[in-house]
Amino acid sequence: MDPLTFDYEKLHVRVDRGVFELFQPNDLTTTLRIPLHWLGVLVHYRKPGRPGELIFGAVNDPRTALYGTDLASFGYRSTMAVRVPSSDEPLFRAYFTEVAAHAGRPVI
């Protein structure tokens, strides 16, 4: 299977052989590499009409939804410097729905 990749602004993510990797060329200190069974992803909107925060992290329970993860389910989380307008959220949902299918994990 070829790696599943997704690019958004200066964010590059990929899944290959059960491992998720995240890269931001302008900030290599926020590179993330994590097995799919621990991955949780959420676009968190605090205020209506404002871009949301993109959150990646490790979940405590691998049966937790891979995308749309509840904030309380994260054992560790990191907010990326990427803001996601609600009009772009379906792009993330489509990619992570495909990733979740490969990992045997649900999405919300």
List PLM regions with ranges.
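Acidic, Ser/Thr- and proline-rich intrinsically disordered linker/docking segments
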Residues: 3-4, 28-108
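Short, compositionally biased strand/turn segments
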Residues: 6-28
